């Protein structure tokens, strides 16, 4: 007969240095296919250690162990898992069922790790439970079954992948006499059908059910009744319908997610408290980004209304130059020279004054701006009615008023403003256009009018000098290069740099930089909150691994690879973080809606789908990173120690 199990000089020692204990000493043993063997011995004789080695849960320190012709010492942990999964079925004294799974779910576990097709394994598991007298009990949890029924579930689990070798550790130890006899009858029947059965027991009555009895004492075989194949049938090959890699991965992922949800449901409060850290962390990050974007957009809109490609030129070397009033070198000829430059779109000379505007007995203080014809293009001011000046050099008595002026002077008169003659101080002027008022809050009630710069210079101010020049640059012109060229041109004309240049693009960049710095600081605080929540996830996952050590041992015993265990716990961590991330994004949007409702138009929180996707990706990454250490710890557990932790 074929040698199925063969041990040659196997020894197993535990401990290091002087603190060592030898449990097995030079054990030689051969078991052929179809035998039913009982290994008997007192407590501490080494029989459980021998069974663990035969079941590829443990490895010897010395000697060789061959299972179905393969040297177990040469196999990797994943290859040992494959041997357990495909050749060995365990029946434990304490059943070792996973409490959160039904009887059917417990039986299916080895088949899941063997890549069996879902419907096929479910039919096979149902048939096994029915054959063992558990029909109608498939969906009961272990706590709803008697001890004998739980042991039958354990037997069905051992057979789901074929169970060429059945290793039974004290199979009747936790059962009453009747249930024990039923289990022994099942084992005898399995052996008759071709399964190789190895029982470990301390009870000679149980051992006598086997055809071969091996006695252990202090780690050595002291008696062996001799081999005898008792099987009367050849074990049929199990037909398993295997799935493709991707379908298998999907199946395992689904099973891991179900286990994760059950674990989260079992510890609702702990899961909720863990998730809160992720919820507030993600919510704070997304909200800070949205508020920062809203503030930035509002600031840019304000600056845009001033014209970011507009350069303003004023007399004096700086704002605190005491000689500004005496400088008379900024003249209309400078504006003409600038207008000839290829990088300039339009130019407007400027003269400022203030005086009363009067019409039919109505009077108001007006800000009078002497400007060129292209001023409205330079500043981007919209003309609602009428046209600009016919000419800006010949002191024409024309005026353009804004909406505030029209309301203050012409409302309730029943007259159209266009074409009417108004007085600016003592200078009469015809209204030729109406411009849109500045919508900034600081100018909402200001009355502003525009006249040709020559008119203001000669008829109102009486000085042939400008108070400023506004220049609009062409699109796609480098602002810094243009400002440098303007400065060089005016310096050559004046012989000295007696002017100052302002460009709102520089102001915009400065404000954007400041805003970005402030946003980054707040974002860092939000990220610290998220990091604290992430550490909480890792902490809870480590606790979960400790609490579920026994479950990990059971899964390893029935054939789970290290990667299977790692995947399960990483998925659980990712699931916690994903749910927390989704709730955090929802909380952020609710917070943004409340802010927009209560901010009274200061600025609005602006959300983007990119930020939401990034937050969702971030929560997934957190689950993977902070779930890795607990998952790695779970995957590296010793199955023997894990099984003993119940």
UniProtKB/Swiss-Prot annotation:
CDD domains associated with the record: ABC_MJ0796_LolCDE_FtsE (cd03255)
Keyword Hydrolase included in the entry's annotation: no
First-tier enzyme category under EC: translocase
Binding site for ATP: 41-48
Coiled coil residues, start to end: none
Highest taxon of the lineage: Bacteria
Cellular compartments per GO CC: plasma membrane
Listed transmembrane segments: 272-292, 518-538, 570-590, 611-631
One GO process term, biological-process aspect: response to antibiotic
GO MF annotations, alphabetized: ATP binding; ATP hydrolysis activity; transmembrane transporter activity
EC nos: 7.6.2.-
Primary location group: membrane
Functional description taken from the UniProt entry: Part of the tripartite efflux system MacAB-TolC. MacB is a non-canonical ABC transporter that contains transmembrane domains (TMD), which form a pore in the inner membrane, and an ATP-binding domain (NBD), which is responsible for energy generation. Confers resistance against macrolides.
PANTHER family: MACROLIDE EXPORT ATP-BINDING_PERMEASE PROTEIN MACB (PTHR30572:SF14), MEMBRANE COMPONENT OF TRANSPORTER-RELATED (PTHR30572)
Subunit structure, interactors included: Homodimer. Part of the tripartite efflux system MacAB-TolC, which is composed of an inner membrane transporter, MacB, a periplasmic membrane fusion protein, MacA, and an outer membrane component, TolC. The complex forms a large protein conduit and can translocate molecules across both the inner and outer membranes. Interacts with MacA.
Family per record: Belongs to the ABC transporter superfamily. Macrolide exporter (TC 3.A.1.122) family.
Record protein name field: Macrolide export ATP-binding/permease protein MacB 2
UniProt source species: Escherichia coli O1:K1 / APEC
Gene encoding the protein: macB2
């Amino acid at each position: 007969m074929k040698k199925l199990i063969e041990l040659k000089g196997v020894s197993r020692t535990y401990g290091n240095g002087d603190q060592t204990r030898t449990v097995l000493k030079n054990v030689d043993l051969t078991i052929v296919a179809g035998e039913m063997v009982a290994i008997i011995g007192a407590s501490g004789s080494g029989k459980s250690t021998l069974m663990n080695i035969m079941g590829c849960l443990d490895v010897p320190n010395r000697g060789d162990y061959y299972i179905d012709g393969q040297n177990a010492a040469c196999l990797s942990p994943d290859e040992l898992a494959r041997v357990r999964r495909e050749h060995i079925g365990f029946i434990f004294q304490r059943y070792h069922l996973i409490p959160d799974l039904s009887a059917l779910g417990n039986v299916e576990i080895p088949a899941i790790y063997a890549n069996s097709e879902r419907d096929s394994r479910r039919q096979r598991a149902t048939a096994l439970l029915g054959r063992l007298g558990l029909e109608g009990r498939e969906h009961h949890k272990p706590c709803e079954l008697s001890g004998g029924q739980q042991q039958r579930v354990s037997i069905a689990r051992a057979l789901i992948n074929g169970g060429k070798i059945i290793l039974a550790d004290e199979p009747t130890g936790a059962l009453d006499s009747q249930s024990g006899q039923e289990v022994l009858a099942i084992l005898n029947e399995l052996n008759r059908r071709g399964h190789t059965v190895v029982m470990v027991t301390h009870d000679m009555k149980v051992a006598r059910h086997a055809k071969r009895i091996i006695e252990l004492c202090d780690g050595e075989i002291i008696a062996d009744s001799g081999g005898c194949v008792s099987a009367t049938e050849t074990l049929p090959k199990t037909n398993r319908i295997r799935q493709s890699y991707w379908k298998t991965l999907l199946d395992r992922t689904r099973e891991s997610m179900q286990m994760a949800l059950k674990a989260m449901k079992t510890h609702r409060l702990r899961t909720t408290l863990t998730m809160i850290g992720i919820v507030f962390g993600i919510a704070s990050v997304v909200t800070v980004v949205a508020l920062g974007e809203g503030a930035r957009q509002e600031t840019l809109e304000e600056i845009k209304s001033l014209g970011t490609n507009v350069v303003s030129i004023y007399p004096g070397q700086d704002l605190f130059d005491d000689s500004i009033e005496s400088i008379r070198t900024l003249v209309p000829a400078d504006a003409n020279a600038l207008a000839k430059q290829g990088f300039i779109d339009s130019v407007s000379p400027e003269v400022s004054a203030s005086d009363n505007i009067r019409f039919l007995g109505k009077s108001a203080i007006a800000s009078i701006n002497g400007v060129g014809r292209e001023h409205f293009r330079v500043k981007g001011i919209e003309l609602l009615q009428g046209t600009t000046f016919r000419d800006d050099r010949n002191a024409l008595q024309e005026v353009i008023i804004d909406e505030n002026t029209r309301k203050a002077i012409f409302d309730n008169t029943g007259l159209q403003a266009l074409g009417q003659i108004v007085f600016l101080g003592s200078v009469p002027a015809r209204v030729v256009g109406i411009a849109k008022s500045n919508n900034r809050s600081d100018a909402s009630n200001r009355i502003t009018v525009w006249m040709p710069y020559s008119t203001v210079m000669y008829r109102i101010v009486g000085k042939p000098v400008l108070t400023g020049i506004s220049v609009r640059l062409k699109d796609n012109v480098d602002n810094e290069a243009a400002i440098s060229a303007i400065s060089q041109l005016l310096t050559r004309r004046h012989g000295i740099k007696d002017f100052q240049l302002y460009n709102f693009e520089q102001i915009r960049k400065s404000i954007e930089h400041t805003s970005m710095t402030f946003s980054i600081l707040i974002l860092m605080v939000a990220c610290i909150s998220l990091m604290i929540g992430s550490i909480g996830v890792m902490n809870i996952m480590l606790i979960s691994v400790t609490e579920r050590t026994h479950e990990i041992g059971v899964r390893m015993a029935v054939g789970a690879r290290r990667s299977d265990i790692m995947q399960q716990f990483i998925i659980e961590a990712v699931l916690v973080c994903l749910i927390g991330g989704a709730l955090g994004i929802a909380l952020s949007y609710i917070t943004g809606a409340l802010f927009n409702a209560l901010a009274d138009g200061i600025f609005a929180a602006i959300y983007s789908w990119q930020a939401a996707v990034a937050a969702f990706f971030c929560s997934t990454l957190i689950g993977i990173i902070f779930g890795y250490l607990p998952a790695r710890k779970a995957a590296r557990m010793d199955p023997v120690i894990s099984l003993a932790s119940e």
